[in-house]
């Protein structure tokens, strides 16, 4: 029987905001970015992006049957745990990344205690283990808006049933602290916590708008350091300054657009689509790596939305400090639009993103969600995939 491979070529237009119900450690000190975000002299404005999947050179994915978005995976003993969007944050477990994966319950006992956004099914969980306890950082928001918040729950066990929801640690758009820089111009979703070798913990977050940011956490890991006393030490990690697609608000004649105290729109960005999100920091000596998803994450039923070359792909920058600056191979700062593409669409792999890094006895693993183009472009059909990483001259390369 002949097997027909349908090649999808990249070139057109997409939406200006992420549409989804979902997700997603050692350092020196750096300096804070205290200025509003503006394109700099080294800013890259991308008119077109990467070659067709056929010419990508990316390896095939280790595909699985676990349907997920923005997974967070940890390994405890011989068991893998995956935390992802779903009622009260869904937990799956398996004895192999390849599966089979079994749903074992929910992380929270009900809705998030944060009274914002989609409380019933928080997005982008990021689970870590430190000091004998598991911490799961999560987001609540609404699609296309930055009226968002990040919360945290903790437990002595990785499975369901024993978690305490500590609630809000940081928010943007509306609410206490949302008028503090850079929360007054960013989107507090897609949390990722990186713990330094000296025990210092950093919260990385951000989606669209002004990109990815970092703030330090207190030692107890459930409070942002300096937020209450005006000494917040925020660092700008990465951004997409170029208008990758036109905003729906650009020609809007609507008389009212919800804005923050600084005038920054809360729902929709009239400056256009700046598709960068899903930051994940990892360390592989001697560098710190800032991974992120670039492009459109979801809703590809319309062929025009999947043929324009602006779908998700996984990019990275590196630094000698967890506080940056992070640069790509050309030395371009991620804040100026830099970023090295490590994995993207190829074969039946479409729009990989929402990534994380897992380290086992054999090395580093890049895991992510993706759409299998031979099966479906439906949002609900996104599934877990992964690839091993090799490092060439200090730069990660995806291999099968």
Curated annotation (Swiss-Prot):
The keyword Plastid does not apply. This is Arabinan endo-1,5-alpha-L-arabinosidase B. Glycans are attached at residues 24, 184, 372. Keywords: Carbohydrate metabolism, Glycoprotein, Glycosidase, Hydrolase, Polysaccharide degradation, Secreted, Signal, Xylan degradation. Residues 1-16 form the signal peptide. GO terms for molecular function: arabinan endo-1,5-alpha-L-arabinosidase activity. CDD domains: GH43_AnAbnA-like. The record marks 190 as: Important for catalytic activity, responsible for pKa modulation of the active site Glu and correct orientation of both the proton donor and substrate. It is found in: Secreted. GO terms for biological process: arabinan catabolic process; pectin catabolic process; xylan catabolic process. Belongs to the glycosyl hydrolase 43 family. Its EC number is 3.2.1.99. The active site is at 70 (proton acceptor), 277 (proton donor). One of its GO terms (cellular component) is extracellular region. The keyword Signal applies. It comes from Emericella nidulans (strain FGSC A4 / ATCC 38163 / CBS 112.46 / NRRL 194 / M139). Endo-1,5-alpha-L-arabinanase involved in degradation of pectin. Its preferred substrate is linear 1,5-alpha-L-arabinan. Pfam families: Glyco_hydro_43. The lineage of its organism: Eukaryota, Fungi, Dikarya, Ascomycota, Pezizomycotina. It is an enzyme of class 3 (hydrolase). It comes from the Eukaryota. Pathway: Glycan metabolism; L-arabinan degradation.
């Amino acid at each position: 029987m002949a097997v027909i491979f349908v090649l999808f070529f990249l070139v057109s237009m997409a939406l200006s905001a992420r549409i989804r119900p979902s997700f997603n450690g050692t350092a020196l000190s750096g300096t804070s970015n205290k200025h509003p975000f503006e394109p700099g002299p080294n800013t890259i404005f991308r008119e077109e992006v990467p070659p067709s999947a056929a010419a990508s050179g990316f390896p095939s994915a280790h595909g699985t049957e676990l349907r997920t978005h923005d997974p967070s995976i940890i390994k405890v003993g011989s068991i893998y745990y995956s935390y992802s969007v779903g009622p009260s944050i869904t937990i799956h477990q398996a004895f192999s990344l390849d599966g089979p994966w079994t749903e074992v319950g929910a992380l929270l006992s009900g809705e998030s205690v944060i009274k914002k956004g989609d409380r019933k099914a928080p997005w982008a969980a990021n689970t870590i283990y430190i000091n004998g306890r598991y911490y799961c950082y999560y987001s609540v928001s609404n699609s296309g808006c930055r009226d968002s918040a990040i919360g945290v729950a903790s437990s002595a066990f990785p499975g369901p049933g024993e978690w305490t929801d500590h609630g809000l640690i940081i928010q943007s758009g509306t609410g206490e602290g949302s008028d503090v820089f850079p929360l007054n111009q960013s989107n507090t979703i897609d949390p990722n916590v990186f713990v330094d070798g000296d025990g210092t913990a950093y919260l990385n977050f951000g989606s669209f708008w002004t990109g990815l940011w970092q703030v330090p956490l207190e030692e107890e890991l459930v409070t942002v350091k300096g937020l209450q006393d005006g000494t917040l030490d925020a660092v700008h990690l990465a951004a997409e300054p170029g208008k990758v697609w036109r905003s729906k608000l650009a020609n809007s004649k609507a008389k009212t657009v919800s804005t923050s105290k600084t005038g920054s729109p809360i729902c929709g960005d009239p400056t256009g689509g700046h598709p960068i999100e899903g930051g994940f920091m990892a360390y592989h000596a001697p560098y710190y790596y800032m991974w992120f998803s670039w492009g459109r994450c979801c809703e590809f039923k319309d062929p025009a939305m999947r043929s324009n070359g602006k779908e998700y792909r996984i990019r990275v920058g590196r630094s000698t400090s967890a506080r940056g600056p992070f640069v790509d191979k050309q030395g371009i700062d991620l804040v100026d639009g830099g970023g090295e593409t490590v994995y993207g669409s190829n074969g039946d792999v479409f729009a990989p993103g929402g990534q994380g890094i897992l380290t086992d006895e054999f090395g580093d693993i890049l895991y992510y969600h993706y759409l299998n183009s031979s099966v479906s472009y439906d949002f609900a059909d996104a599934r877990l995939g992964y690839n091993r990483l090799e490092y060439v001259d200090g730069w990660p390369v995806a291999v099968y």
